[in-house]
A protein has these predicted regions:
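Acidic, glycine-rich calcium-binding repeat modules characteristic of RTX/beta-roll
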Residues: 1-69, 80-96
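Low-complexity acidic/polar repeat-biased segments
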Residues: 76-150
């Protein structure tokens, strides 16, 4: 378990399965290939708060899979067992990470996540070892992915 406090914290669980507590402030959570199964527990009601999920090198926007599970948001790197869950995402906006940012500078805002979740809900998640989306998935999802990641 890694815990931040007040202020801007950077939390990186590395490999393995971790719980990351952000606290208040503009926190950065790191997620990459080899990260394992991590969980973010973030609750911040501060106006203008800007927490970021930083996605490591070698992960493209087309490799991220978004799912609504209970009250949580799960983000997986397809082809791997790596997953990060943002606990209680669907309970209240105070639990949100406000931005998802890739190493090449692409950004997805929390207000855009549900469009991807809804589109991906119509498909089964790619199986372990499948590192790219099938042609059918690409046709359906790539326009939406490109429209929301800027």
């Amino acid at each position: 378990m890694l815990s931040g406090g007040k202020g801007a914290d950077t939390l990186d669980g590395g490999s393995g399965n971790d719980v990351l507590y952000g606290g208040t402030g503009n926190d950065m959570y790191r997620f990459a290939i080899g990260a394992g199964v991590d969980r973010i527990e973030d609750y911040d009601t501060t106006t203008g708060n800007a927490d970021v999920l930083s996605i490591g090198q070698g992960v493209s926007i087309n490799q991220l899979w978004f799912q609504h599970v209970g009250n949580d948001l799960e983000v997986s790197i397809i082809g791997t067992g790596d997953q990060i869950t943002i606990r209680d995402w669907y309970s209240n906006a105070a639990y949100h990470v406000e931005q998802f940012k890739t190493s090449d500078g692409k950004v997805l805002r929390d207000s855009q996540v549900n469009a991807l979740v809804s589109a991906m809900a119509g498909f089964a998640p790619p199986v372990l070892g499948q590192t790219s989306l099938s042609t059918d998935y690409q046709k359906a999802l790539n326009p939406l992915i490109a429209a929301h990641w800027k």
